[in-house]
């Protein structure tokens, strides 16, 4: 999967304060997106190797 970047724009207030807040928020979103992409890649790899065992490990007995 490709890493995606998300840009967050703030509204209202002084431009100087918003520019700093937007830069911090944007960086945090990028870090979280990369972590999610990494996790999804790991899950895809497990499913390719043995999907049935992967599903069994998360399904409770009795259909609960």
From Swiss-Prot:
Entry's Gene Ontology BP terms: modification-dependent protein catabolic process; proteasomal protein catabolic process; protein pupylation
Keyword set includes Disulfide bond: no
Record InterPro entries: Ubiquitin-like_Pup
Positions of disulphide bridges: none
Positions in coiled-coil regions: none
Disordered: region residues: 1-32
A Gene Ontology molecular function term of the record: proteasome binding
Keywords recorded for this protein, A-Z: Isopeptide bond, Ubl conjugation pathway
Comp. bias intervals (Polar residues): 21-32
Cross-link annotation Isoglutamyl lysine isopeptide (Glu-Lys) (interchain with K-? in acceptor proteins), location: 64
Region (ARC ATPase binding): 20-58
Top-level taxon of the source organism: Bacteria
Recorded metabolic or biological pathway in which this protein acts: Protein degradation; proteasomal Pup-dependent pathway
UniProt remark on domains: The N-terminal unstructured half of Pup provides a signal required to initiate unfolding and degradation by the proteasome but is not needed for pupylation, while the C-terminal helical half of Pup interacts with ARC to target proteins to the proteasome. The C-terminal 26 residues of PuP also interact with PafA and Dop.
Family stated for the protein in its record: Belongs to the prokaryotic ubiquitin-like protein family.
Assembly notes: Strongly interacts with the proteasome-associated ATPase ARC through a hydrophobic interface; the interacting region of Pup lies in its C-terminal half. There is one Pup binding site per ARC hexamer ring. Interacts with the Pup--protein ligase PafA and with the depupylase Dop via its C-terminal half.
Function statement: Protein modifier that is covalently attached to lysine residues of substrate proteins, thereby targeting them for proteasomal degradation. The tagging system is termed pupylation.
Protein name stated in the entry: Prokaryotic ubiquitin-like protein Pup
């Amino acid at each position: 999967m490709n890493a995606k970047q998300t840009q967050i724009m703030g509204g209202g207030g002084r431009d100087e304060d918003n520019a700093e807040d937007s830069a911090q928020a944007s960086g945090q979103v990028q870090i979280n997106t990369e972590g999610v992409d990494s996790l999804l890649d790991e899950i895809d790899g497990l499913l390719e190797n043995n999907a049935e065992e992967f599903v069994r490990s998360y399904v409770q007995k009795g259909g609960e």
